[in-house]
């Protein structure tokens, strides 16, 4: 599943679609182990970010960005 991330508060590139669309010799799909996600969530919690997600982690990227914007990190 691909997520498109946009955040004016974090100045993420508006040209993300062209970056995603670029041809590459590497596989663009990224698989992240559930343990790595939990470690990231623990770090964000220690930094004071409140990140909620469902059991499939489908909305985790949006929740992280929203939490970081709220924290002014």
Curated annotation (Swiss-Prot):
Region forming the signal peptide: none
Induction: Expressed in the early phase of the viral replicative cycle.
Origin: domain of life: Viruses
InterPro entries assigned: Orthopox_F14
Record key words, sorted: Early protein
Gene Ontology terms: biological process: symbiont-mediated suppression of host NF-kappaB cascade
Disulfide bonds: none
GO annotations of cellular component type: host cell nucleus
Pfam families named among the record's database cross-references: Orthopox_F14 (PF06076)
Gene Ontology molecular function terms on file: protein sequestering activity
Family according to the record: Belongs to the orthopoxvirus OPG058 family.
Official protein name in the record: Protein OPG058
Species classification: Viruses, Varidnaviria, Bamfordvirae, Nucleocytoviricota, Pokkesviricetes
């Amino acid at each position: 599943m691909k997520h498109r991330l946009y955040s004016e508060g974090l100045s993420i590139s508006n040209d993300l679609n062209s970056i995603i669309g670029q041809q590459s010799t590497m596989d663009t799909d990224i698989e992240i182990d559930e343990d790595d996600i939990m470690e990231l969530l623990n770090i964000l919690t220690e930094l004071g970010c409140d990140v909620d997600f469902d059991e499939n982690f489908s909305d985790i990227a949006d929740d992280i960005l929203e939490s970081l914007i709220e924290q002014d990190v």
